[in-house]
Amino acid sequence: MDVRRRPVKSLSSAKTATAGEPPKSQQQHPKASDALPLPLYLTNGLFFTMFFSVMYFLLHRWREKIRNSTPLHVVTLSELAALVLLMASVIYLLGFFGIGFVRSVIRPSPDAWDILEDDNAINEEDSRREPCAEAIDCSLPPKPKIVHMVPQKALNPKSAFADMMVEQPALAIAPLTEEDEEIVKSVVTGKIPSYSLESKLGDCKKAASIRREALQRITGKSLAGLPLDGFDYKSILGQCCEMPVGYVQIPVGIAGPLLLNETEYSVPMATTEGCLVASTNRGCKAIYASGGATSVLLRDGMTRAPVVRFSTVKRAAELKFFLEEPLNYDTPAHVFNKSSRFGRLQGIKCAVAGKNLYIRFTCSTGDAMGMNMVSKGVQNVLDFLQSDFPDMDVMGISGNYCSDKKPAAVNWIEGCGKSVVCEAIIKEEVVKKVLKTNVAALVELNMLKNLAGSAVAGALGGFNAHASNIVSAVYISTGQDPAQNVESSHCITMMEAVNNGKDLHISVTMPSIEVGTVGGGTQLASQSACLNLLGVKGASKESPGSNSRLLASIVAGSVLAGELSLMSALAAGQLVKSHMKYNRSSKDITKLSS
């Protein structure tokens, strides 16, 4: 008799299965009898017979001991064997009845990120039944073809897994030829500079391989875990990185869909922090179920501020008055605008410190982040000013009044790059069922933590929970400059109860988001793919600058989702629990080699 409990296939679960993940009905757990080669009916019959026979034998023996006044703890060899068989049969039967019964009647408790499945209103909101979503094929895609595969030698040939192919990391490097060996030795001894390998060899991949081998010999440290193959080193030559020896792999997760300005976006996030993508995804779910978020672009202008020095304070002040006079604005603007098709001067602001003058130029830069563009225009203006102010000494093209890659009040107040505000109204039932908290608790915690707490800490632009987490993850995945996360993460998060205290209004104001969709790391294959996913790849031909502005709005919307979810976890006391579940390494660090 077949006593297995067969899982019932559910149509609803099959429909909602995500791509690449089998539905729950198809996820079968191994049974106890799967390890035995006998047919199922024979295995069941064997263990049923064993259980009742051994039980009868033991009860009969114990009855005789009681009659003969023999201690029960004194067992013979046959009784010991019977006990072992009894335990084996009990374990087998529990594998069918006990565990299966528990799985069928006990439902796992919902974790911090799950919405209640029996809530029809939330399920309808979360079903994403929009025109663009209905066209999506939710069936399981075919398994991708795996290249670079080698047989696993350590497997048992008789095992069912012996014929499987497993992917091997690109760690093994082809042996060096005699010519390459000589080059490596020359690099090690210093006869050939490491930085000149690309120009001497004319092969960027070969140069990276030789530099890598030379580095290992010089330091005596292995780079076996750092991949070398599978990267286009020519694409970074003279643009992204010098003297490469490999590349670092960072996993990319997807949060969303983020419903922003009535459009859905799947947000790529490159991170090694567990729970970050899951938390942001929960925020996106809450925003989606509440009707979406709205963003507004307030400003769009990159800055560069050179520092110049004069012999007297008076001369420094004269240049300040000249540049800030509206009647004189057209002259430097004309000189500045000649440097680029897209760079357009928007304004000049000066600050005097003794004999030194700091000149802050602001300009539009199209779809580029624009730091190089504005620097080129500034240099042209400085060269022009030398004719009227020959005693002006240019001390540096950047005097930190910009201010780039540093927390600064000038960016927090005046803005730099894109200044964006994003808001959403989260419904009461969504706050309770998706975010597992309530509106009053969120409003109070936001005031105590993000506003008062940040003020107590003397924060500068840090009136938020973790904006930099989301900004950094999106920046890395889309090829932005990660160092500009410093000023780009300036954010103030506001929350208040609306609609008679039932719903939550949340907003993030970010005055200095510095992003671009052309130049720098955006042209790399992986980063370009992420930009394409968002629909902002490259420069916009119809409206120059619109792609970078949209990317800034998506960053702000993602920060809104991340802030909403983390604050909810804090208000509900779920932060530690979720991080223990999603942000814990399973590796024994004591066994890792240094």
Curated annotation (Swiss-Prot):
Q: What is its EC number?
A: 1.1.1.34
> In what way does this protein cross or attach to the membrane?
Multi-pass membrane protein
* Catalytic activity, reaction form: (R)-mevalonate + 2 NADP(+) + CoA = (3S)-3-hydroxy-3-methylglutaryl-CoA + 2 NADPH + 2 H(+)
- Where would you say this protein principally sits, based on its record? endoplasmic reticulum
Residue intervals on the Lumenal side = 1-37, 103-549
What is its induction? Repressed by darkness in roots and leaves, but increased ginsenosides accumulation. Repressed transiently by mevinolin (Mev).
UniProt pathway annotation: Metabolic intermediate biosynthesis; (R)-mevalonate biosynthesis; (R)-mevalonate from acetyl-CoA: step 3/3
The GO terms this record gives for MF are: hydroxymethylglutaryl-CoA reductase (NADPH) activity
Its localization reads: Endoplasmic reticulum membrane; Plastid, Chloroplast membrane; Peroxisome membrane
- Gene Ontology terms describing biological process: coenzyme A metabolic process; response to jasmonic acid; saponin biosynthetic process; sterol biosynthetic process; triterpenoid biosynthetic process
- Looking at the record, which segments are called Disordered? 1-32
Q: Which residues are glycosylated?
A: N261, N337
Q: Where are the transmembrane segments?
A: 38-58, 82-102, 550-570
- Which ranges of this chain reside in the Cytoplasmic compartment per its record? 59-81, 571-594
Report which superkingdom the organism of origin falls in: Eukaryota
Q: How is its activity regulated?
A: Competitive inhibition by mevinolin (Mev) is leading to a significant reduction of total ginsenoside in adventitious roots. Triggered by darkness.
Active site annotated at which positions? E273, K405, D481, H579
Q: Which tissues is this protein detected in according to the database? A: Mostly expressed in the petioles of seedlings, seedlings and roots, and, to a lower extent, in seeds, leaves, stems and flowers.
- Keywords noted in UniProt: Chloroplast, Endoplasmic reticulum, Glycoprotein, Isoprene biosynthesis, Membrane, NADP, Oxidoreductase, Peroxisome, Plastid, Transmembrane, Transmembrane helix
Function, as annotated: Catalyzes the synthesis of mevalonate, the specific precursor of all isoprenoid compounds present in plants. Component of the triterpene saponins (e.g. ginsenosides or panaxosides) and phytosterols biosynthetic pathways.
The record's family statement is: Belongs to the HMG-CoA reductase family.
Q: What is the name of the protein in this document?
A: 3-hydroxy-3-methylglutaryl coenzyme A reductase 2-A
Q: Which organism is it from?
A: Panax ginseng (Korean ginseng)
* Taxonomic lineage: Eukaryota, Viridiplantae, Streptophyta, Embryophyta, Tracheophyta
